[in-house]
Amino acid sequence: MAKKEAEEKVRVGKKSAGDWAVDIFITIIFGLFTIVCIFPFYYIFINTISNNNLVMTGKISLFPQGIHFQNYVRVLTLKELPPALFVSIARTVLGTIFTVFAASFPAYAFTRNEYWGRKFFYRFVVVTMYFSAGLIPLFLTYRTIGIYNTFWVYIIPGIVTPFNLILCKTYIESLPASLEESAEIDGAGYLVRYFRLILPLSKPILATVSVFSAVGQWNNWMDTVLYTKDKSLQTLQYVLYQIGRASC
């Protein structure tokens, strides 16, 4: 009996030629995909350590030429870098937290049938996706409400995003209604159900919204140009943009 089991394990553990071919094919495909994903980062890196004139003329292809590290020395010795890095980190962290809360909490409210006018307010928020306020109206609005040339001009305008709201609402609607009904029978109120039931079950979509918000906050530098004038409010991306312009 033991011998048969051992032979069965050996037989199961062996791979046929077809299995090996499939494994090799999958490995090659994923290897190529990995190279495609990594190459942009590699290309950027070799450009940073190559001769600037060669980079500007497009003569750098696969390998660096005229290797030097002056670009890194220049960036790391900038006095504007530490405060700009702090501003970028602060806006990314705070902006992401506020955005996640502002997307998930109203989304949960919009899924509740007992609230009057929920469909109207939901459509009112969603319809803003199809219209742009324009640069001048936004500038005047920010100055009127007092956030122009302040740190909060990075946070407040991006708190409520219709796209994130739609994502959260769609996901929350897919959760089993019986879970919330059971919590309601046990005496859980609206806030208790939101914080102790909905949020834990919505971790996947909250992570997605967090990534979208964090990447958007970190990469955005145009609002620094348009809505701030103090150097203390400059973000890391704006400082790097200025360095890039100066090197051209």
Spans of features found by a protein language model:
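A hydrophobic, multi-pass inner-membrane permease signature
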Residues: 2-247
